[in-house]
C-alpha cells in the first residue's frame, strides 16, 4: 500500500463529559470514520447520537482498574494496523487527548509508522462547563 492510500488518523477529544459538548469538527471526523477506537470516558456511550454507527467498527480500548484493560502498546498497534489497511480511523478520547490522555504517545507511534494524524482537541472544561463561576475573578483594581 502506498502512503497516498493511508488516511490521517483523527485523534479526537470528546470534551468534558456530556456527549453534546464535542466539537463540530470532532463529530464530523466520527461521521467519516470507518473504525472508531473509544475510551469509557466522554461521549463514547452516546456515540450513536453523534453518527450512524451501523456501518462502523467500534473498538473499546478502555483502561479500567481491576477490570478489562488494553495496554497503550496494543492501542497503538490497532491504530497503525487499521490505518495501514487504508481505513479511516478515529480515536475518541474523553476530555482532551493530551491531558492525561496519552495522545502524544499515539501521535508518536503513528509518526514512527509514517501515518499522519489530525488532532481535534476537546473543549476544555475550565471554559465550557456552565458552573456559574468565572474563569478569572479579580476583586481589586
Where are these regions (language model features)?
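Class I S-adenosyl-L-methionine
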Residues: 1-19, 24-123
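Residue-level detector of conserved catalytic or cofactor/ligand-binding positions
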Residues: 133-141
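Alpha-helix C-terminal capping segments
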Residues: 112-113, 131-134
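Short alpha-helices
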Residues: 124-128
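Short Asp/Glu-rich motifs
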Residues: 49, 129-130
